[in-house]
Amino acid sequence: SDPLPEKLTPLFTAPALPVFHLPTDVDVQSYDVVMAADSVDRGFDTWRSTLREDQIVVLIDHHPDIDMPADITLIDTEHSSSSEIVYEYFEQHQIPITLPVATALLMGIVFDTGNFKHTNVTPRVMRVGVELMKLGAPLAQIGNVLFAQTRVGGVKLWGRALERARYFPTTGMVVTAITTRDLRECDAE
């Protein structure tokens, strides 16, 4: 098991600190149902072959490019995030949402909406955000933890990306690239 990533610990208070387990560190064979959420084909497929034939696989996502087979697939591109989908499931099935769950769900929404700044922000996701805040999820603190605590390495990496950026006036597109070497050299891994 991995501890909660250090930058996220201010969002949770003991004894509610969650422990994160990587799939490789969990005996997934011992579960009847395995759920994967958010960009599931960008990692879930690397260990899916370890599942038993009789295990139920549930995929939850808001990205349109998910084509992985599952027993239950819940993909809705009209939602801002997988967290919004999970919230609505809990709401429809009258599943109580604890403070740590409300915080985690709001964190997912804030991340996928760019702190409510992206074009995927809808009145519905704003309502969900308000409901999670009513349950105690700390919006300002989540925004600060996710977006305002930029490490020096991240700033250096942005510098490299901007330095290499090229503008194409015919399309209005700006293109840049960063490499794994850049990540390493900027200490932004």
Where are these regions (language model features)?
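N-terminal small/polar loop signature for handling phosphorylated ligands or for N-terminal nucleophile
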Residues: S1-S49, E53
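Hydrophobic helix-and-loop "lid/oligomerization" segment in the mid-to-C-terminal part
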Residues: S1-T9, V28-Y31, F111-E189
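Solvent-exposed alpha-helices and their adjacent loops that cap or buttress functional pockets
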Residues: V26-Q29, S49-R52, D67, I97-L99, ...
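Hydrophobic/aromatic beta-strand patches that form the interior of the parallel beta-sheet core
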Residues: V33-M35, I56-I60, I72-I75
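Short beta-strand segments
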Residues: M35-D38, D61, G108, A177-T179
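Short glycine-rich anion-binding loops that position phosphate/pyrophosphate groups of nucleotides
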Residues: S39-R42, H63-D65, T180-L183
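Short helix/loop capping segments that flank catalytic or ligand/cofactor-binding pockets
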Residues: F44-T46, M68, E185-C186
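Short alpha-helices
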Residues: H62-V128
